């Protein structure tokens, strides 16, 4: 069998296959015999239809189409084996099937073109001695104080306020309704859907609801009704309301202040369900946790910007079949996260939405797959090995989590890949020159750049 290979983009190989004349004749004869045995035609017993009657009744094109379906599939498999091609997934027929039917003649050579996905290719250009910036998170004692204050607020007693006006930090119980303000500055008659509530509890704090809404309550007294206008942000989730002026009519029905519990051992015990008996022990644990969080945040930042450098300096060609598998993995992970949050995934992952969700997940899937392939290739080149004790420990943890119903061989491979990538990232960090900047610096620069592009 004559086969011409052509390298195609997206990790594909193009094949032009010429099927010998004797093979096309045999395929035709085999198909006609098969149809004669299986086709039901009026006036004939099954399996007893004469060849010419069969061709006449079914039509030559229908028979040739049936021949070509098997011929293309069999010839492609033979060509892949002959050329030692490591094909992934199904093939794509590049020739027009209708043209092949028209050109096909039993006993004459027949040619067609197809493409198959092959394993991804990785081109390593530069990965040692990378230079980049990353954000360094530092433990700030103020974070501990803020956490404890928030816990005090959560366990605070709400005390009715009657002798003063509302101020920031209070809790307002109110009725409200919103109406659009037209270009003439007049309030429209209809209430906007979703902007009406009764006995709504609102914390009078900065950042609650939309800008200006909380401020409108400051200075009000219980039983007072007031109108004020706010402008919804341009990036508000409801596009119909984004950037619009809305007049709110609010009635403050109750006003409450928070009476914070004392910051003492009793409070620590209550806030932690008796996990800690003393405030000092709880503070020590919280401090250690916050310090660990800062280290993890720093490490995540280093790896994020390291991966960006690897992606910029090295390249991959990804087969579509692998990308689709990774898209499925991304969506499966999202479904599990939503499920853990108590969200009904069936309302999000509907039949109509899945194609859109898959397209949205594609960039992340391609980046994840590319990163993994680059790191795996670096590990091979640099002969990076994983720690056996760490592998065994992680394997036992995974078995305990899964308990039963898992393929141990696949589990071992997954853990080995995970630890290899982790070890490779650690090795690359040691090889890199990293300039640390305060946390939030780079993200602020990126946000500013993104706004500039808009």
Swiss-Prot record:
Pfam families according to UniProt: FKBP_C (PF00254), Trigger_C (PF05698), Trigger_N (PF05697)
One cellular-component annotation, GO: cytoplasm
Molecular function via GO: peptidyl-prolyl cis-trans isomerase activity; protein folding chaperone; ribosome binding
Catalytic activity line of the entry: [protein]-peptidylproline (omega=180) = [protein]-peptidylproline (omega=0)
Start and end residues of each PPIase FKBP-type domain: 169-261
Domain notes: Consists of 3 domains; the N-terminus binds the ribosome, the middle domain has PPIase activity, while the C-terminus has intrinsic chaperone activity on its own.
Primary role: Involved in protein export. Acts as a chaperone by maintaining the newly synthesized protein in an open conformation. Functions as a peptidyl-prolyl cis-trans isomerase.
Protein name: Trigger factor
Source organism: Picosynechococcus sp. (strain ATCC 27264 / PCC 7002 / PR-6)
Native organism taxonomy: Bacteria, Bacillati, Cyanobacteriota, Cyanophyceae, Oscillatoriophycideae
Gene: tig
């Amino acid at each position: 069998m004559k086969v011409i290979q052509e390298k195609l983009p997206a990790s594909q190989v193009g094949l032009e296959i010429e099927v010998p004349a004797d093979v096309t004749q045999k395929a035709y004869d085999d198909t006609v015999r098969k149809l004669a045995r299986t086709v039901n035609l009026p006036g004939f017993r099954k399996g007893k239809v004469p060849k010419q009657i069969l061709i006449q009744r079914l039509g030559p094109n229908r028979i040739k189409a049936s021949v070509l379906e098997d011929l293309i599939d069999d010839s492609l498999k033979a060509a892949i084996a002959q050329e030692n091609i490591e094909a992934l997934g199904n093939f794509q027929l590049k020739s027009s099937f209708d043209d092949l039917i028209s050109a096909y003649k039993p006993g004459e050579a027949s040619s067609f073109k197809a493409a198959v996905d092959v394993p991804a290719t990785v081109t390593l250009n530069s990965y040692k001695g990378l230079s980049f910036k990353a954000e360094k998170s530092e433990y700030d004692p103020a974070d501990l104080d803020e956490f404890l204050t928030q816990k005090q607020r959560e366990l605070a007693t709400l005390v009715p306020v009657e002798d003063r006006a509302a101020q920031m930090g209070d809790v307002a119980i109110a009725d409200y309704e919103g109406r659009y303000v037209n270009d003439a500055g007049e309030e429209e008659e209809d209430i906007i859907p979703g902007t009406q509530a009764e006995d709504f509890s609102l914390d009078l704090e900065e950042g609650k609801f939309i800008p200006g809404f909380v401020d409108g309550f400051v200075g009000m007294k219980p039983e007072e009704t007031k109108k004020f206008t706010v402008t919804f942000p341009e990036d508000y989730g409801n596009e119909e309301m984004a950037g619009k002026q809305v007049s709110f009519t609010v009635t403050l029905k109750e006003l409450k202040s928070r009476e914070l519990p004392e910051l003492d051992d009793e409070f620590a015990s209550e806030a932690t369900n008796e996990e800690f008996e003393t405030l000092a022990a709880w503070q020590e644990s919280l401090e250690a946790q916050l310090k660990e969080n800062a280290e993890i945040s720093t490490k995540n930042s280093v790896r994020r910007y390291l991966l960006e450098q690897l992606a910029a300096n090295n390249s991959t060609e990804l087969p579509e079949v692998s990308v689709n598998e990774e898209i499925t993995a991304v969506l499966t992970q999202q479904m599990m996260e939503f499920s853990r949050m108590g969200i009904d995934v069936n309302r999000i992952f509907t039949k109509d939405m899945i194609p859109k969700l898959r397209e949205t997940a594609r960039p992340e899937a391609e980046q994840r797959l590319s990163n993994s392939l680059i790191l795996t290739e670096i590990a091979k080149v640099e002969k990076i090995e994983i720690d056996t004790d760490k592998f065994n420990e992680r394997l036992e943890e995974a078995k305990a989590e899964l308990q039963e119903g898992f393929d141990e061989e696949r589990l071992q491979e997954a853990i080995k890949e995970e630890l290899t990538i982790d070890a490779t990232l650690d090795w690359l960090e040691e090889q890199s020159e990293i300039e640390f900047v305060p946390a939030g610096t780079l993200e602020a620069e990126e946000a500013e750049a993104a706004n500039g592009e808009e």
